[in-house]
Amino acid sequence: MNSYKADLHVHSSHSNKPTYWAMRKFSVPESYTSPKHLYRIARERGMDFVTITDHNSINGAMEIAHLPNTFISAEITAHFPENGCKVHVVVLHISESQFQAIMELRKNVYEMVAYLHAEKISHFLAHPLYAQNGKLNCEIIEKSLLLFTTFEIKNGCRAHRFNGFTKRLVSSLNENVINRLADTHNLQPYGCTPWIKGMVGGSDDHGGLFIARAHTTVYDTPTVDGFIDAIKNGDSWADGDDGGPLTMAHSLYGVAHSFYRERLGQRRSGATPFVSALLDRFFNLGEEKGSFLDKVRLFILKNLPASRNHTGKSFEEILDSEARLLLSDTAFLEAIRHADSNRKIFAVTSRLANRLIFHYTSRLMTLPYNAGFFEYLSTAGTIGLVHTLISPYYLAFHHQHKGKELIRNLTIALPEMHHKEAVEKTALFTDTIDGINGVAITIKRLISTAKSRGVELTVITAGDEGEATVEGVKRFPSVGDFVLPEYPELKLNFPPILDVMNFIEREGFTRIHISTPGTVGLLGLLIARMMNIPVAGTYHTDIPQYVRSLTNDEFLEQAAWSYMIWFYSQMEEVLVPSVGTREQLRSRGLPTERMKPLPRWVDTEVYSPEMRNPSFWKSRGVGLGRIVLLYVGRVSREKGLEMLVAAFTELVDSGAPIALAIIGDGPYRQEMETNLTGYPNQFTGYLTGEQLQRGYASADMFVFPSATDTFGNVVLEAQASGLPVIVSDEGGPRELMRDGETGIVFRAGSVKGLVDAVRLLITDPERMSRMGQNARDFTLTNAPDINETYNTILHLDKHNTR
């Protein structure tokens, strides 16, 4: 049997009334594809028949009506009169007089469909799940199942989630369902067997790039009339590829490029020759490929010495410079050489956008305070311009996720579908994964818990390409990084925005959890909002407190609070590690009902007094006849370590038999070591595994003076190891011990309070021993089920674990 094909949903330059506001504002038509070009491309791509389905117009189809194997069609915007819902109905193989009659009836879809059946006009409902004006609902879909006998189940601009659902929807119908819907809506269905629907496909191409990407196929119908009859009889099927955000975005770019060339011609190409070369390579729909002199000029410019020093350059010059560097990057070009057009365009656009956004964001962050308001405004405005240039992707990702709520409602309204819910997949966004801090430790434990419980969890982060690959972690290569002055070893990596968005779309994540409010976390929030994905977050770190501690600047502290409250208020729920943190956030304006406790504890089998080794600290030069005070964590000022140095030296000077052990590292280490010169102390750097466990258990007491920690895993680890703990009365650690039972609480910021607390224990060995035992018992008694510790983040109660 021979098959015959046609793209039954494709647009030409006669689709000139765009639906998007920005395109209407600048009088940009929906398509620049000439009918003759469309015809030629469709035939070259294997289409046996060609039609054009412009919006409410047959002018494009009329232009090629004299060519072989063509027929006149149109995409009609029809209205459900009861609520004004717009739907698109494609009418096939019509006459001019029929088109005029259809246009007169389209304000009432019932009257229009009755006319189509009376005239025996083949027609189908295009992209049935796409809401044109926000009024599409289950009732309209149910009525459409009665009105239409043929449905577009493969639209070349729509993602598989919608195309596939549409196919399952119309395939699940039976006589009982149709009868029930007919009774419910008092509407007589069309067709002899209205539960058996015809299925077609079309590219829905507007930019000329994806003509025939999706199409309709029938068997043994070598004539137009035979092809149309096969569709009427339900003997057709949809073929080709589904679409998605990239297809939609690149169609918009194709239209924009044609608009640019039409309005500006060659006036601007001289200023940006490399950008023009890229655009022409991907989007030029005609035969014009640039003159010989243009190619010679481009070759000469391309081979001149290049530089990434953009000082003093305009935006256009920087953009063209980056395009030139890209065109000269043979490794990059080779990597995308065999990719399809969508992947090539996306890779190029993403790379250019990343470089430009990073450049201007870096400039904004490094502007001096006296740069002036307009300099800040200009730089911020340029960042906005770059986002505007890549807004077709934002628009496409957003539109490809509209309708998910409708799908959920339809699965309830039509249980006959036996719709299988998508597997829950969580993407956890974090700016830190490689450190020894509490956030990184928690995330690594989450990965392990998720794996053991059969939960699909992927941690999203950004970093250097050379960093080690960790199972369960998707590390995107950082476009660049911002180094914080007070944290020289702590970088904020700038993630590749579009690449991360595309990954989330491609993998089909159903939930996003944000662990940090940095650049990666902010991108996670943007994606969640753009793609209508449920989002939650964890408040791990008291950023405003850190800002205050590091800068002593009240304005910056308030700015940090404003950002944090805005950031977390965008989420459906926020997990907080302590009651104190919850009250602090509530007082700053975060709604109480959004906050939930984050249950965390410590593995008491890993951290245990049994790991004690009397020679552990003695072999490191401390502990010889002295009581070992231990601190574990980041060595930085905001941890209260200046106060610890002052208290420790005062105690030693007064004759106290103590030594100080520091496990950890950070920007304050060198200065702290200098200040402790001549005193019994030992800095080990970061320890892990058994060495860390023995370091805890082999000390005598644990001192944690920080007032900025929201939780404090180390306080639990110390108590599990049998150490009494000394903590401040501010922050989360205070809630992880019992004052007077497992340790002592002192007033935050008080050197005297810390001195008195240490002295109370070292002068009463029996008390110190009793508190250490109480601390161990406390962690054993209060430890939750280890399997349930991370349920809140992983939503394990909602998963069917394997």
Q: In which residue ranges do the predicted regions lie?
A:
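Domain-core and long-helix interface of multi-subunit machines
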Residues: 3-29, 96-217, 240-244
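Nucleotide-activated donor-binding/catalytic signature segment of Leloir-type glycosyltransferases, i.e.
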Residues: 670-690
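Carbohydrate-associated surface elements
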Residues: 463, 580, 601
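Conserved donor-binding/catalytic core segment of Leloir-type glycosyltransferases
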Residues: 428, 623-639, 645-649
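A short, well-ordered alpha-helix in the C-terminal region of glycosyltransferases
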Residues: 753, 760, 767-781, 788
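An N-terminally biased module of ancient metal coordination in phosphate/nucleic-acid-related enzymes
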Residues: 1-86, 209
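Short hydrophobic beta-strand element within catalytic cores of glycosyltransferases
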Residues: 724-727
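Aromatic "clamp/platform" in nucleotide-sugar-dependent glycosyltransferases that forms part
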Residues: 707
